[in-house]
Amino acid sequence: MLARRQRDPLQALRRRNQELKQQVDSLLSESQLKEALEPNKRQHIYQRCIQLKQAIDENKNALQKLSKADESAPVANYNQRKEEEHTLLDKLTQQLQGLAVTISRENITEVGAPTEEEEESESEDSEDSGGEEEDAEEEEEEKEENESHKWSTGEEYIAVGDFTAQQVGDLTFKKGEILLVIEKKPDGWWIAKDAKGNEGLVPRTYLEPYSEEEEGQESSEEGSEEDVEAVDETADGAEVKQRTDPHWSAVQKAISEAGIFCLVNHVSFCYLIVLMRNRMETVEDTNGSETGFRAWNVQSRGRIFLVSKPVLQINTVDVLTTMGAIPAGFRPSTLSQLLEEGNQFRANYFLQPELMPSQLAFRDLMWDATEGTIRSRPSRISLILTLWSCKMIPLPGMSIQVLSRHVRLCLFDGNKVLSNIHTVRATWQPKKPKTWTFSPQVTRILPCLLDGDCFIRSNSASPDLGILFELGISYIRNSTGERGELSCGWVFLKLFDASGVPIPAKTYELFLNGGTPYEKGIEVDPSISRRAHGSVFYQIMTMRRQPQLLVKLRSLNRRSRNVLSLLPETLIGNMCSIHLLIFYRQILGDVLLKDRMSLQSTDLISHPMLATFPMLLEQPDVMDALRSSWAGKESTLKRSEKRDKEFLKSTFLLVYHDCVLPLLHSTRLPPFRWAEEETETARWKVITDFLKQNQENQGALQALLSPDGVHEPFDLSEQTYDFLGEMRKNAV
């Protein structure tokens, strides 16, 4: 008899998933039975939740490792089937999570209130006992009621805004709805019940004490807004004249409606204040300067105190955080601000050769007479990094539109940035908006901006050297059209352990921190950990919901190490354009070290490629055009020609002149602007049309002479390379 054929891996996994689904459905049905109210039964159900959750995690790990190569026969729609199984496991996880939360709350309720059996036994004992025992029992009951009142308030609160449930166990409510608060927790998430009897967690910042008297007071105060006064106070206690201008009532009305206002006394003074629901007091620093404001008094709404100097400014991020549009751990992007401050953190700065302290020779560009090219220079850090994905990244609110999701990385020692700041743009799917991926599959060449494979070089001797990753989004506010960039979290991967040994080359799962790299102990989304209960199961679920970044450090082979050693000592870039950077370095070495009449000469050098190539590092789409043109040209070369280094360099210069120079000085090409989709689309259309014409006409000469092509007026800087001038510019 023939042996039974073993199931294929995906088929076997699908069978196990169906068995798990049946067990979860059975457990959910069992929890609905009347017997499930017993404590022992609840404990049994809770243990089953943990066991099933572990089994689901094992299946998820096995599913992630599966590939088409594991199948003995071709499977139709393999990726789609894997995605369906992943969705099923996620659904089962959510069901178990909801059941575990329900059981945990029932256990909490049981601790706070006596069971029916205890009440019956107490009533029987009270009937048998005498009058003195009845009095003692009444005192004990009153004591228990007072103790239970510590966590069960039974107070009514009114919702000051709309809140939509974000996770299982939250309570959705609308503005103006009356809620009965059952339990006040110190973490700011209270258990409340609405008029329909629905119970769940609500944020306390959305609630205000409700009473009919306060409602009457508020309505009367809103009717007399014209009598509201604003006073300026200084550190000396001097009081500025009250506001009496006729526009004050309109301003005060805007305050009550929006919570954000701008008070304009004169053209030169504009105070921007975010009115928070929790009351704040005026703050004075140790130097005695005025550094705060007294927030809006919710009950009286009678006075608003403002400091006069220095002008208190609260940025857009504070406004968005107060409005609930972004999580509390989001901040203005630190690395983006460094890029805007100057040129010293850009790749073109680190690409330029560096002089020795004597100013008589180059420090990182030397000539190898034996090889006839620039000399290889090893560095302390030389590695290749792959960005895999970002998971569970919180979503911003509907009031802002996300223009770009990206990761910025640089070398960091805990205090300062030690390299250029490299940016990799992420892609995402509407089905999984919290997951970012890199290096997507494309029909043509992969744009260098999306390339998740990065090289990293550094010769820094710092023992705390590591890689700083900052996840960010570029956004535009729907209401004002204001643009900005937010940090969605950061993480620091130290490259050496305490004994100075490099960390191993492997995949790292890094949990993100909130705030800025100079702030410690801040979470990206504090609401995730605030909801963590004491159970191990819920803590595991909470850890899985934390934002994280997956990266892989790859070990270098001999060829990769030789290639990287031709680059500057300190530089971060993408692997897809590394061969173009090496061409630039080799041609730079030829011009500065081999072909110069005198090494002490500082004359200007006529070389368009050296003068303009650093500009490509700030215009990735033009760099992609050069990559595409060079790949097309290289495919036509013979093997003997590819082995000839001098022939390759001269051919590369011809391709550069035909492709890059006309594009850089064309008036049809809009200026490069980060995260502007319309501009990026228009630029890529111009570039694509130009490359197509070059391919058809076998060069750019016809396009340059065409009356349709309009170019910028000629400038001598297009042809002139001044290496000392570039260094002076970078130093400034």
UniProtKB/Swiss-Prot annotation:
One of its GO terms (cellular component) is photoreceptor connecting cilium. Residues 115-145, 210-236 have a biased composition (Acidic residues). Widespread expression, with highest levels in pituitary gland, spinal cord, thyroid gland, testis, skeletal muscle, lymph node and trachea. Weakly expressed in heart, kidney and pancreas. Expressed in nasal epithelial cells (at protein level). Expressed in the renal collecting duct (at protein level). It comes from the Eukaryota. The modification Phosphotyrosine is found at Y46, Y349, Y721. InterPro entries: NPHP1, NPHP1_SH3, SH3-like_dom_sf, SH3_domain. Keywords: Cell junction, Cell projection, Ciliopathy, Cilium, Cilium biogenesis/degradation, Coiled coil, Cytoplasm, Cytoskeleton, Differentiation, Disease variant, Joubert syndrome, Leber congenital amaurosis, Nephronophthisis, Phosphoprotein, Senior-Loken syndrome, SH3 domain, Spermatogenesis, Tight junction. It is found in: Cell junction; Cell junction, Adherens junction; Cell projection, Cilium; Cytoplasm, Cytoskeleton, Cilium axoneme. Belongs to the nephrocystin-1 family. The SH3 domain mediates the stable interaction with Cas. This is Nephrocystin-1. The gene is NPHP1.
